[in-house]
């Protein structure tokens, strides 16, 4: 657990509704009087946002998987040291739209890189900082991919590099997130992301409540 605050990550396949749930949870917790910081990965700092533009745009073959991992990790170093860790030290609730679980899923399972190496790199880069709780928004891969591709249609910023990959890739990513939750149930909660946004928010709030009840925030 963060030294004083509470660190929540929201993970899931593309199109699972992470960004909307992050906003809803932030509003809900803010209404309860909690000091909430919302951030995202890759991103969260000017340097991280620049890296985001590099790795999420263009053709899939633009980056070697190892280069992709190192870029994501470089963004996370800046994010943790300049944003997440200071906010936790101030006793804030940090909600991140993606974190290291996505690296394990996309660059590990998806790209075939060693999970052990990714975990070692993460430990060195972040001081082995992991969320107090990760909410995994679970949705059929085909539904999520269709949602995500519709969202990207007409957007001026092209962040569709992963959406360009086939359904089998996204099914592997979904399985990877579920496997992470099964291995560490004390720090994960799987949320059914089907249904209305209000229904998903209610499920997420119900899963989060017992963890926050034990947190120093």
From Swiss-Prot:
Which GO MF term does the entry hold, naming one?
A: ATP binding
Superkingdom field: Bacteria
Q: What keywords does the record list, in alphabetical order?
A: ATP-binding, Kinase, Nucleotide biosynthesis, Nucleotide-binding, Transferase
Give the reaction(s) catalysed.
Answer: dTMP + ATP = dTDP + ADP
> Which GO BP terms apply?
dTDP biosynthetic process; dTTP biosynthetic process; dUDP biosynthetic process
HAMAP family xrefs: Thymidylate_kinase
NCBIfam families in the cross-refs: DTMP_kinase (TIGR00041)
Query: What is the protein name for this chain?
Result: Thymidylate kinase
**Which organism's genome codes for this protein?**
Cereibacter sphaeroides (strain ATCC 17023 / DSM 158 / JCM 6121 / CCUG 31486 / LMG 2827 / NBRC 12203 / NCIMB 8253 / ATH 2.4.1.) (Rhodobacter sphaeroides)
Record lineage: Bacteria, Pseudomonadati, Pseudomonadota, Alphaproteobacteria, Rhodobacterales
């Amino acid at each position: 657990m963060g030294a004083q605050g509470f660190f929540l990550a929201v993970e899931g396949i593309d199109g699972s509704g992470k960004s909307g749930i992050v906003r809803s949870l932030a509003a809900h917790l803010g209404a309860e009087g909690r000091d909430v910081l919302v951030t995202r990965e890759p991103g969260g700092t000017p340097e991280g946002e620049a890296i985001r533009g590099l790795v999420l745009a263009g053709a899939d073959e633009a980056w070697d998987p190892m280069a992709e991992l190192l870029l994501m990790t470089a963004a996370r170093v800046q994010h943790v040291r300049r944003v997440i860790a200071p906010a936790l030290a101030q006793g804030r609730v940090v909600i991140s739209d993606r974190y290291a679980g996505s690296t394990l899923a996309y660059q590990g399972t998806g790209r075939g890189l060693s999970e052990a190496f990714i975990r070692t790199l993460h430990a060195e880069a972040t001081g082995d900082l992991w969320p107090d709780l990760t909410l995994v928004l679970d949705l059929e891969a085909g539904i999520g991919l269709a949602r995500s591709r519709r969202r990207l249609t007409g957007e001026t910023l092209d962040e569709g590099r992963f959406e360009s990959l086939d359904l089998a890739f996204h099914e592997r990513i979904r399985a990877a997130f579920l496997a992470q939750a099964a291995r560490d149930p004390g720090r994960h909660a799987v949320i059914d992301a089907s249904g209305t946004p209000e229904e998903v928010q209610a499920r997420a709030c119900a899963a989060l409540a017992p963890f926050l009840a034990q947190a120093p925030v």
